[in-house]
Structures are given as structure tokens and as C-alpha cells.
Amino acid sequence: PHTIVFLGDLFKIWLAPPKFWSDLHRQVLLSFQSLKDKGCNVVFIAGNREMLLPGKFTDNWKKKLPFTHLIHNDWFLNWGNQHFGFIHGDTINYHDRQYLRWKSFSHSLAVETIFQLMPGPAARWIAERIEAMLVETNKEYKVHFPEKEIQEFAESVLPGVDNYFVGHFHVDREIKVEGCSSVLRIVPDWLSQRKLIRISAEGTKEVLHFKNSSFENAH
């Protein structure tokens, strides 16, 4: 492919510096490096399960991570005759204050400094325990799809693009806005649905389902 965009949450938890990587992390990231080495644009948009990612994607970090682009907010692509936007989306639901406080704390300089000083296995163990604990908290917002907040977000971004892709919510939905032909697409998660969205050179979209060791058109 010319460009591949990942909308974050690659693993249940991932500490970005290589000293923290498990064998699974290395296996997946080596596959991304293979794409990068072949000239593919590998765009990674940070989600809520990544920690210790650099604020600036310096040349030193580009040698460590298998991405051509590292994005912390939204990213845009002109492809064919279409203009596309992408974001992870974990901050769209502004009413989930408990999560927003947690994200601010877990990505604070103090917390990141403590993790950086730890040995790799110990840091991974603590991060995994924190992730397991978070699964059991704030369930009201995790099972509730924020219709109102998503609609408001769509109204704010769709006038400037043809399509806008959002991750995080682990559902397959299209959101439209009255008086606008653009579409906001909630992208299905890979872990449970094994789906991805491919955009042709002309800008048309198709959903591919990975089944029986190959991809097939899902619609």
C-alpha cells in the first residue's frame, strides 16, 4: 500500500521505548518496519493504550519506531479527489471526566519519568495491572456510545473533509450531518471484528474482513 493509517490502541498496553517491548510487540512492530522499508507511509495516531510516546517525533525516535508519522491529535490526507481526516477519538466524549483525568495523569511528566527509570519487565507488569484495573472502572461510559458527543464532533469536522475516520469506540458506524454530504466513520476494531477499511486510488472505500487467512469484501 501507499499509506497505512493505524488509529491507535495497537496492544492492550504498549510502552513505546524498545526496552519495554515484549516479544509480541517486537513481532508486530517488525512487520510495520517492513512496510516502512518498502516505501510505505506508516502513520500511527496515538490512542489511549500507548504510553511514553515522544511529544516530538525526532530523528532519534524515527530510528526506534517503525512509523513515518507519529500523530497525537488528528491527521489529514488528500487521496484521489478526496480529503480525509483521522483521529483516535478517546477525547471526543468530554463528559467522561474520570477518563480524561486519568489520561492527563498517566501521561504526565512525573508518571512518565518514573516508568522510564524502571526495568522493562517491571514497567510492563505495572502497566498491565493498571490496564486490568481500568477495565473494571467507569463501565457506564465504556458500554454507552456517546451519540450526542459524536454528533457534535461530526458537525465540527465534516464540513472540512469528505470522510473522517474515528477509532477508539470499537463499533462499525457511519455518522452523517444534515446538509452535508461528508461522512464520519467509526472504524471497527481489529481484535474482535478483523476488519479494515481500504481506500482506492480514486478515493472510494471498501471494508475488508480478514477470514480464513485472507481478506474478503465485507459488504
Predicted features along the sequence, with ranges:
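Conserved beta-sheet core of the metallophosphoesterase superfamily
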Residues: N60-F67, H72, H83-G85, D90, ...
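Membrane-proximal helix-turn-helix segments that form the acceptor-binding/catalytic region
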Residues: Q33, M133, F153-S156
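C-terminal regulatory/interaction regions
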Residues: E216-H219
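Active-site-proximal loop/helix segment associated with metal-binding centers of metalloenzymes
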Residues: I87-E149
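Short, charged/polar low-complexity linear motifs in solvent-exposed/disordered segments
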Residues: S31-F32, C40, W102-S104, V111-E112, ...
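Short low-complexity stretches enriched in small and charged residues
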Residues: P1-H2, K36-I45, H88, P119-A123, ...
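A structural signal for the main folded, soluble domain(s) of proteins
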Residues: N212-S214
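Core catalytic region of metal-dependent phosphoesterases/phosphodiesterases
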Residues: P1-W79
